[in-house]
Regions:
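Short secondary-structure junction/hinge motifs that connect adjacent elements
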Residues: 29, 83-86
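Short coil/turn segments at secondary-structure boundaries
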Residues: 82-83, 402-405, 453
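Structured non-transmembrane domains adjacent to transmembrane bundles in polytopic membrane proteins
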Residues: 58-80, 90-188, 416-604, 608-610
Length: 729
């Protein structure tokens, strides 16, 4: 017997040394990759595309119109109006001195030098287009429409876009020139708004990432009550983000995928949240197995065997949902699909290779002060989750009916969610200079001044098209684009004709990016196409309208496909059609309830005007794909226990042993997405709240009460059509 014991110990020692070397090699490989990934973090912002082309539908009429409109200017790309607004006593009849000062300023502004590039501002604006001050009828405002050449201004200087620096320079210069004269200045319009968006996205690189890491670290310290253990899952999550960022950077640099600041922000919180979730699951199972195995190598082998299936199934579910975004009309949505999928794949890879290696290297002491000993102590059904399990076991019908009714009540409010889209001025949680300027502009000029609807028509149709468009109730004026006198640089009365076509500018009475402005587009298109079906309607309002329409189309197409894919994955994982349908139904109910709560909170607490048209789709992708994770973690363990002790005991045992870790995982994911709220962007703040609340709802109510109670009520038939359905309850 002693010889057999010695032989067994020798074999165990050989296996242990082999596992130790594998762990060391794994860590070295990850550290090597991390060295390459570090450079990608500092350069990722240089491959972002945050202009309208990053969101525009490829097949939209506004896209086609934009391609034609380029031919009417010497610039290679779209011109972005920067609206310089001056407010005060600017009536030439009563304050000729101030009016003349504005004239002189507009004549000399473009000759000033941008410090960052040491080039004159004229380099970045439309060539041959003078800055002409336009006084308001009430004499209290002057508007200067400066056409920014985005093809030039979008260049990078020292790794940062020069475009926002131009707007910042003009804002500071105008303030310096006019504040002493009692004149208030703003830079608004598309260029001003996008500069503020760039500034908001710029904080994603540092502020968002740092805050997320701090929040995750605090939660891990609270969960593990250990001064050292929290470092391993956090290091693993950071490593996963490093490799994901590196891959995304190189793919975006080669223009294989689209990346914008919004997508990068989502990538950061998604990877840190998902990787930490998977790490919590592995560490909990490893700690459990350390009680049953003297060798930490054997404990890790059994733990990996227990978690690899739910982690891969969970990650595959999220990846499947994200990759369906490739069917989107919007290039920004299509970009999120592969970017998010790379993040989830990196998270799974790190947790299943790097984290086990780290845990093996450090041994049991890493759990100090609560070091798990080899004592073969089974999980006792005690504590909070034992009480929850007993409640579900005693009164399953009362539990699932009450929770389902509560969810249905909140789901009823989902119909009140305003998802008609946000104007650019409503996109910020703070009042930026561009937002204030846009509001003040509407007080003194037609709201659409400086950002007209741009209509491409055949020269022969110009008169009839202008008349038809002018009859649209929201159109203030319609004027044609004319040539510029090369000597005076002033517009002439001669039409600018390119390939037999001309451009009409329709100024709206309403804000061009408002709901009313976007609703004007189908009316203008209808009026114009009655004259000639080949007329193209573009401009900022048309772009906004086309983006909203594509978002609604994506909701109709993508959501059903995602549901079908998740149902198939669940069916294969649980070997049960019934269980898959049940889990999917509960998560959809949870999603609807979350939308209902969002409708109430956004309107009555945060005071948001509504949501972006893409919000329901993004919320659905993350809530359903991530929300189903916790049911996967629960039900795979329930199935494992049901094979041993029956479905009734299995659901109680599964709930009890997974309750703590799943709730912790949900808290981490909710916190990481909640961090999106620190950014001054309404869309990300709303998405962060929706995912955070929805995940907590899933972990605390759906996974803890609704699903276990339903499974307890249904019994072994939940496993239909597998053989497990015939097992005694």
């Amino acid at each position: 017997m002693s010889q057999e014991v010695l032989s067994e110990k020798k074999k165990s020692g050989v296996k242990g040394r082999k596992a130790l070397w594998i762990a060391i090699v794994s860590i070295l490989v990850w550290l090597s990759i991390g060295g390459f990934a570090g450079g990608a973090f500092s350069k990722i912002s240089t491959v972002q595309e945050n202009d309208n082309s990053a969101f525009l539908p490829d097949s939209a009429e506004s896209t086609i119109a934009g391609e034609v409109l380029v031919k009417f200017s010497s610039q290679d790309d779209q011109l972005f109006p920067a609206l310089l607004l001056l407010l005060g006593d600017l009536n030439p009849a009563t304050n000729a001195q101030a009016f003349e000062k504005v004239n002189q300023y507009s004549a000399t502004l473009l000759s000033k030098t941008l410090p960052e590039t040491e080039k004159p501002l004229s380099t970045y604006f439309a060539q041959g287009v003078p800055l002409t001050p336009i006084p308001s009828a009430d004499g209290k405002a002057i508007l200067i429409n400066a056409q920014l050449d985005f093809a030039v201004a979008d260049a990078n200087v020292d790794g940062e876009p020069v475009f926002p620096k131009i707007i910042e320079f003009i804002r500071e210069d105008m303030e310096k020139e006019f504040t002493s004269a009692g004149i208030t200045t703003h830079v608004t319009g598309p260029a001003g708004l996008f500069a503020d968006l760039f500034e908001a996205f710029g904080s994603i690189d540092t502020r968002l990432l740092q805050t997320t890491l701090i929040v995750v670290a605090i939660i891990l310290i609270v969960v593990y009550r250990s001064p050292v253990l929290w470092i391993l899952p956090l290091f693993t999550a950071a490593s996963a983000l490093g490799i994901a960022t590196m891959i995304v950077y190189y793919l975006a640099r080669e223009e294989i995928i689209d990346l914008n600041g919004q997508t990068q922000g989502i990538l950061d919180v998604l990877v840190l949240g998902a990787a930490t979730d998977y790490a919590l699951l592995l560490i909990a199972r490893y700690r459990e197995e350390l009680h049953h195995h003297q060798s930490r190598f054997d404990a890790m082998r059994i733990a990996l065997r227990g978690v690899v299936e739910p982690i891969i199934a969970s990650g595959s579910t999220v990846i499947a949902g994200l990759m369906v975004l490739l069917l989107s009309d919007l290039s920004s949505n299509r970009g999120l699909g592969p970017v998010g999928s790379i993040g989830i794949a990196s998270s799974m890879l790190a947790v299943l290779t790097l984290l086990p290696a780290l845990l093996i290297i450090f041994g049991r002491w890493i759990f100090w002060p609560k070091i798990p000993r080899f004592d073969d102590v089974d999980e006792k059904l005690s504590g909070l989750w034992s009480k929850v399990g007993n409640l579900v076991d005693r009164r399953p019908r009362a539990v699932w009916i009450s929770t389902a009714l509560a969810l249905l009540i909140f789901a009823g409010f989902s119909t009140t969610l305003k998802s008609d889209g946000l104007s650019q001025s409503e996109a910020f949680t703070t009042r930026t200079d561009s937002v204030i300027g846009l509001e003040r502009l509407g007080e003194h000029f037609p709201s659409g001044e400086g950002t007209p609807v741009e209509i491409v028509v055949d020269q022969a149709d110009i008169a009839s098209a202008a008349a038809a468009i002018g009859r649209v109730s929201t159109v203030a004026s319609v004027v044609p684009l004319t040539n510029v006198d090369p000597l005076t640089q002033r517009p002439t009365s001669e039409l600018k004709v390119v390939d037999g076509k001309v451009v009409l500018y329709a100024t709206l009475k309403v804000a061009p990016d408002s709901a009313e402005g976007k609703e004007s587009i189908p009316l203008i298109r209808q009026a114009a196409k009655a004259v000639n079906p080949n007329i193209l309607v573009g401009g900022q309002s048309a772009i906004g309208y086309d983006v909203d329409q594509s978002s609604r189309r994506d909701n109709r197409v993508i959501i059903p496909i995602v549901l079908l894919l998740i149902a198939v994955i669940l069916g294969f994982l649980l070997r049960s059609i019934f269980a898959a349908a049940l889990l999917l139904g509960t998560v959809v109910l949870s999603f609807a309830a979350t939308l209902g709560v969002c409708a109430l909170v956004f309107d009555n607490v945060f005071g948001f005007a509504g949501t972006d048209a893409a919000f329901p789709l993004f919320a659905f992708i993350f809530l359903v794909a991530l929300g189903i994770d916790y049911n996967i973690f629960l039900m795979t363990r329930v199935r494992e226990e049901s094979l041993k002790i029956g479905t009734r005991a299995g659901i109680i045992k599964g709930l009890t042993v997974t309750g703590g870790v799943i709730t912790s995982a949900g808290t981490v994911l909710a916190a990481t997405f909640g961090v999106l709220g620190i950014l001054p962007l309404v869309f990300l703040a709303e998405l962060g709240f929706a995912v955070a609340f929805g995940v907590l709802l899933d972990t605390i109510i759906v996974r803890s009460l609704l699903v276990p109670a339903l499974v307890r009520q249904i019994g072994p038939k939940i496993w239909w059509p597998s053989k497990l359905q015939h097992q005694e309850n």
